[in-house]
Structures are given as C-alpha cells and as structure tokens.
Amino acid sequence: MKEYKTPSYEETVKLGERVAKSLPKGSVVAFLGGLGMGKTAFTTGFAKGLGIDVDVSSPTFAICNTYIGEENTLYHFDMYRVDGWDDLYSTGFFDFLETDAYMAIEWSENVYGALPEDTLMIEIERISENERLFKMYKKSEEEE
C-alpha cells in the first residue's frame, strides 16, 4: 500500500495526474470515500495526466461521463445509485472493461464484486478541511 497526503485541491489534482501517467491503458481506478473527499478533484488530474483537457464533473445524475482525448478515453462512473447487477449492466460498465479505455469509479463499494482484480483501489480520508490522505493498493492485494 502506498500513502500520499495532499494539502490542497491543487495538490490532489497533481496527484491524480501523476497516477494517470504511471498506469497502463485499460486501467481501472476505484475510489472509496464519502462526499467532498476529493474524488472528482483527483479525476480532474487523472484526465489531465491522460492528455484529456476537459472540465471534469461528478457524473452523479448521468452515472457515466465520457472524456475523449487524442490518445486516451476516460469513463468516469458514479455508482452511488447503482443497486445490483441489473443496474450495473445497464450502465455499460462491463462493455467498457473490454476496451483499452481508462475507468475512474466513484462509490466503488457499491460494485466491488464486479471490479477487476488489478483495479487500483484509492481510499480517501479527510485530515482537515483541505488536506487528504490517499491510500492506494491493488484490489488483489487487499486480502494479504
């Protein structure tokens, strides 16, 4: 497990950018953390690290936002309202796993059983109003 502290929104964005640049195509990142923890800020940087220059917003109502760059695609999911396998199938989640696109998944605890074993799990904890602690590990390493 790797841990990173970010003192501000801007540093959270930069962390997301660095992580994106370190991952191979087709990678899945899954966030664990409540409202206002920095999931969308991290995803903003993640998109930037993939060369996708867009305004990232939480896909709360759309369930999935798609961001397309010249070389990479990012599917940004919010699984908060997903309740069961039927709901998950209707999002296109499993189809997107078969592509070389990147996926960022908010509220991943709701779809934990469907996440690939090599998913990068990112637990976010609030230290103070602006400071966050990010704990990162592969899903397959959780049981160890």
Regions found by a protein language model. Give the residues of each.
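N-terminal pre-Walker A segment at the start of P-loop NTPase domains
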Residues: 1-18
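Short hydrophobic/aromatic beta-strand immediately N-terminal to the Walker A/P-loop
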Residues: 28-30
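P-loop (Walker A) phosphate-binding loop of NTP-binding proteins
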Residues: 32-34
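Conserved lysine of the Walker
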Residues: 39
